[in-house]
C-alpha cells in the first residue's frame, strides 16, 4: 500500500516537472520570434528634408517669383515694347487687288495702334471681294437671234434672188421676163422652198403610238402581262422592254414595233415582275419600218387588239381617245 502511494506521488511530480518545462520552452520561443526590433531601426528622416519629384519650374512659389520678375521687367521697359510693336506694324503689308507694290510703297505709313489715335480699318482682298459680290449687279440681257427655220431660209434666198434680178433689170443688164436662165433659176428656188416646207411635217410624224389601258380602278399584273406578250411573239430585249421582230423567234432580225410600260420609267424588271403592276402599256412603231409599212401597221393594230382582249383592257389612239374605225383609217392614211 505504501509503495502505491509513493508511486503516485512520483508520477505527479514527474508530470508537474514536464508541464513546467513545456511552459518555459514555449515562453522562450515566443520571446525569440516576437522580439522588439524598434530600438535597432535608424531614426526617421525629418519631414523638412523630404525630396520632392516636382520640378522647380512647376513650383508655385518659383512661378510666382518668376512672374513677379517678368512683371517688373515689363513695367520697367514700356518704351522698348512700344518700339517693338511699331516696328512690327511697319513690316506688315497688305496688297489690294489692282495695286502694285511700287504704288503701295509710296503711300504714307499708317499710324501705330499704340499712338492713341484711331486707325481706319484696312480692307483686305476677301472683304473687298465679298463687298463686290454683295452689291446688286445689273446684267443686260443678251438677245441672240434665233436660228431661222428651213422654210424661212429658203424664202429669204428666193427674195434675195428676185431682188438681185430686179436690180439687174433696172440697170438694163437682163430681162427677167424674156431671159430663159432667169426663169429656170426662179423655178429652182421655188422648188427648193416647196421641198423644205414638205420635209417638216414628215419629220414630226415618224412614230405611230397606241395604248392599252386597264379599266378604271384596276391594274394589269406583271406576270400576266409578260405571259400575254410572249404568247403574241414579243421578246424581252434592249432597253428592258419587249420587241416584236420581223421574224418571230429570231431576236437577230430587225424590230418592227415594241411595247413599254406606260408608267415611268417605262421598263419591265423581270426580277421583280411578281410584285409589278401597271395601269397601261404603250406600243410604238418607228417610220419608216423594216419592210412594208402598211403590212407592219396592220400587224401592229391586230397585235394591240389581241393584247387588249387578253388583258381585259381598252385600246386608245395617240390622243388618248378610244381607238375606233376613224382612228384606224387615219393611221393607215399616214403610211399609205
Curated annotation (Swiss-Prot):
GO biological process: division septum assembly; FtsZ-dependent cytokinesis
Transmembrane intervals: 3-23
One term under GO cellular component: cell division site
Topological domains, Periplasmic: 1-2
Bilayer topology annotation: Single-pass type I membrane protein
Matching InterPro entries: Cell_div_ZipA, ZipA_FtsZ-bd_C, ZipA_FtsZ-bd_C_sf
Main location: membrane
Cytoplasmic side: 24-336
Subcellular location: Cell inner membrane
Keywords annotated in UniProt: Cell cycle, Cell division, Cell inner membrane, Cell membrane, Membrane, Transmembrane, Transmembrane helix
Protein family: Belongs to the ZipA family.
Subunit text: Interacts with FtsZ via their C-terminal domains.
PANTHER family: CELL DIVISION PROTEIN ZIPA (PTHR38685:SF1)
Free-text function comment from the UniProt entry: Essential cell division protein that stabilizes the FtsZ protofilaments by cross-linking them and that serves as a cytoplasmic membrane anchor for the Z ring. Also required for the recruitment to the septal ring of downstream cell division proteins.
Protein name (Swiss-Prot/TrEMBL): Cell division protein ZipA
Gene: zipA
Amino acid at each position: 500500500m505504501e509503495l502505491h502511494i509513493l508511486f503516485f506521488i512520483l508520477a505527479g511530480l514527474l508530470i508537474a516537472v514536464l508541464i513546467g518545462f513545456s511552459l518555459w520552452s514555449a515562453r522562450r520561443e515566443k520571446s525569440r520570434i516576437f522580439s522588439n526590433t524598434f530600438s535597432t531601426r535608424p531614426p526617421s528622416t525629418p519631414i523638412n528634408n523630404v525630396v520632392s519629384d516636382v520640378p522647380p519650374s512647376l513650383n508655385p512659389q518659383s512661378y510666382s517669383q518668376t512672374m513677379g520678375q517678368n512683371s517688373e521687367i515689363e513695367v520697367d521697359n514700356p518704351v522698348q515694347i512700344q518700339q517693338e510693336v511699331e516696328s512690327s506694324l511697319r513690316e506688315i503689308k497688305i496688297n489690294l487687288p489692282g495695286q502694285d507694290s511700287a504704288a503701295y510703297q509710296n503711300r504714307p505709313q499708317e499710324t501705330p495702334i499704340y499712338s492713341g489715335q484711331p486707325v481706319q480699318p484696312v480692307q483686305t482682298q476677301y472683304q473687298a471681294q465679298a463687298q463686290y459680290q454683295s452689291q446688286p449687279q445689273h446684267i443686260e440681257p443678251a438677245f441672240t437671234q434665233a436660228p431661222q427655220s428651213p422654210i424661212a431660209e429658203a424664202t429669204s434666198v428666193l427674195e434675195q434672188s428676185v431682188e438681185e434680178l430686179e436690180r439687174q433689170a433696172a440697170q438694163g443688164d437682163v430681162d427677167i421676163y424674156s431671159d430663159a436662165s432667169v426663169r429656170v433659176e426662179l423655178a429652182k428656188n421655188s422648188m427648193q422652198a416647196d421641198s423644205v416646207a414638205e420635209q417638216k411635217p414628215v419629220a414630226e410624224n415618224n412614230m405611230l403610238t397606241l395604248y392599252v389601258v386597264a379599266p378604271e380602278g384596276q391594274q394589269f399584273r406583271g406576270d400576266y402581262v409578260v405571259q400575254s406578250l410572249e404568247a403574241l411573239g414579243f421578246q424581252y430585249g434592249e432597253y428592258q422592254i419587249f420587241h416584236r421582230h420581223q421574224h418571230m423567234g429570231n431576236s437577230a432580225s430587225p424590230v418592227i414595233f415594241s411595247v413599254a410600260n406606260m408608267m415611268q420609267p417605262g421598263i419591265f424588271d423581270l426580277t421583280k415582275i411578281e410584285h409589278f403592276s401597271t395601269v397601261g402599256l404603250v406600243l410604238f412603231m418607228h417610220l419608216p419600218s423594216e419592210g412594208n409599212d402598211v403590212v407592219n401597221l396592220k400587224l401592229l393594230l391586230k397585235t394591240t387588239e389581241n393584247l387588249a382582249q387578253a388583258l381585259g383592257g381598252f385600246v386608245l389612239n395617240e390622243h388618248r381617245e378610244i381607238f375606233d374605225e376613224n382612228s384606224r383609217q387615219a393611221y393607215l392614211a399616214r403610211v399609205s
